[in-house]
């Protein structure tokens, strides 16, 4: 992952659902019934006079933002008065694995690090980090020291972040799901009276209509792999995106398969080939292919649709608005009616350094942050009038502030986001967020192997070669250098390279994971 891509991913994660307040959300008893996690205290009250002054240092993945000093001054002024605490940020602008290496190095050197942003994409499992002494066991501390925030999670949420029965991460409260959607220009849907899109066949009808009616517009773009595009539609859960490992939602044995060995693999490749053959993709000289979706592409209006994930349209429309574009906007249409995998709340959560003496104070800070809209707004959006401007039913950056440095892209936000407090950034967004949340509730769930991270150390050479081969195969498909004989050769080559041995090792670990859970 290069640094440009980190910026794009950061913007997507931060902006993805930047809206919504408690007013339109149905709050429910999230932890009803007997449960070992339920705190006995009623409401958590902070008495700053009885607290020793404490400074906390948080590590985040992202670039340094010039406004961080101003935001910290404002936050710490209120935080110190109410909890006798001050916080500091350390932002590391690197790939996740190097970010983790830096954290480990700083902890070993004795530098202040009380907590850090955790990613499921780290090259080591949470269990390994715990065994190596980098993360604290929060099973009891979470409900005891942040009871108000803890009560905002359902039991399914809490169960989904357990590792061998223990909690090591304080999750954010923003529900995400890898739900594949066609994200289309809604003005063109209405202009040409195109029927609602409910599946890939409907989407292809849309593409054909755009090609015929508006030949100056490129019908579609996607920046994904075959497994990323189609696993959902055929009832598969993706275990490893880069390696193309999947299993069926309805398989009680949770049998792991290589994507190319599924019965739908060739159909998926042929479908992508048809998009190229039918003229739906970008033409560059004599080549036809795809491109990474960027701001210039979104604002040019030259593409009528993209295949992405539910929630991407919030980011796309926010970009249009910052550029003053109101002639069109993007709307998502789900491409299947089945379930999609809900992303673990551990993603972008907060892990506490096991060597820190301030674990309870970190949790106290989180409970303070999540206790009121006022505290949340100050940390997430800064000072009103200086870092954001209040409109009728939304907020936006002040004039002249670029998206890269606005509250959209502050790296310290992601681990603490809460759907009950998020502010809308465009008019009418609250209603769209309510629809998003409803889809997440009804059409996504935690998969059977949620939280499982395979250890590939015993099959590392097979893994490395497969990762390259899978990427090369996907590239050959989207540039049109593909036929069924090439798929047959790829399947054979992967078997010869030992993919069955890799799958068997991952299956062994997955079976043990399920038994332990």
Residue ranges and their predicted role:
Residues 2-517:
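Extracytoplasmic/secretory soluble proteins
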């Amino acid at each position: 992952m290069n640094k440009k891509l980190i910026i794009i991913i950061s913007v997507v994660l931060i902006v993805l659902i930047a809206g919504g307040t408690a007013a339109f959300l149905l709050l429910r008893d999230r932890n009803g019934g007997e449960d070992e996690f339920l705190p006995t205290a009623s409401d958590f009250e902070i008495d700053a006079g009885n607290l020793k002054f404490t400074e906390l240092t948080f590590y985040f993945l992202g670039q340094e933002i010039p406004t961080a000093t101003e935001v910290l001054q404002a936050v710490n002024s209120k935080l110190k008065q109410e909890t006798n605490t001050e916080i500091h940020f350390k932002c590391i602008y690197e790939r996740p694995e190097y970010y983790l290496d830096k954290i480990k190095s700083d902890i070993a050197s004795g530098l202040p690090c009380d907590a850090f942003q955790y990613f499921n994409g780290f090259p080591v499992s949470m269990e390994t980090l715990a065994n190596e002494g980098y993360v604290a066991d929060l099973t009891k501390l979470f409900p005891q020291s942040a009871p108000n925030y803890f009560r905002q999670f359902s039991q399914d949420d809490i169960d989904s972040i357990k590792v061998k029965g223990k909690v090591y991460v304080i999750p954010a409260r923003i529900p995400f799901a890898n739900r594949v959607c066609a994200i289309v220009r809604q003005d063109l849907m209405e202009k040409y009276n195109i029927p609602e899109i409910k599946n890939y066949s409907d989407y292809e009808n849309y593409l054909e209509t755009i090609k015929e009616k508006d030949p100056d517009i490129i019908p579609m773009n996607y920046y994904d792999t075959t497994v990323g595009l189609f696993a959902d539609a055929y009832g598969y859960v993706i275990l490893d995106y880069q390696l193309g490992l999947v299993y069926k939602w309805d398989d009680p044995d949770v049998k792991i398969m290589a994507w190319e060995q599924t019965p739908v693999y060739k159909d998926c490749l042929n479908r992508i080939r048809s998009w190229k053959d039918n003229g739906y993709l970008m033409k560059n000289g004599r080549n036809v292919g795809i491109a990474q979706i960027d701001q210039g592409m979104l604002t040019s209006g030259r593409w009528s649709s993209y295949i992405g994930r539910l929630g991407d349209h919030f980011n796309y429309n926010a970009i249009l608005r910052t550029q003053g574009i109101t002639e069109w906007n993007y709307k998502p249409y789900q491409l299947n009616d089945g379930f999609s995998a809900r992303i673990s709340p551990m993603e972008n959560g907060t892990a506490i350094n096991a060597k820190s003496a301030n674990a309870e104070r970190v949790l106290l800070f989180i409970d303070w942050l999540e206790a009121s809209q006022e505290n949340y707004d100050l940390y997430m959006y800064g000072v009103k009038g200086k870092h954001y401007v209040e409109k009728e039913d939304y907020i936006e950056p002040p004039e002249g502030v670029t998206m890269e440095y606005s509250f959209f892209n502050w790296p310290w936000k992601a681990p603490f986001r809460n759907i009950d407090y998020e502010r809308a950034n465009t008019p009418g967004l609250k209603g769209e967020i309510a629809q998003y949340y409803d889809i997440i509730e009804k059409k996504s769930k935690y998969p059977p192997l949620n939280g499982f991270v395979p250890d590939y150390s015993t099959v590392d050479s097979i893994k490395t070669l497969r990762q390259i081969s899978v990427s090369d195969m996907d590239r050959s498909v989207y540039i049109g250098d593909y036929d069924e004989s090439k798929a047959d050769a790829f399947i054979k080559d992967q078997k010869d390279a030992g993919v069955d041995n890799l799958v068997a090792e991952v299956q062994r670990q997955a079976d043990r994971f399920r038994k332990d859970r």
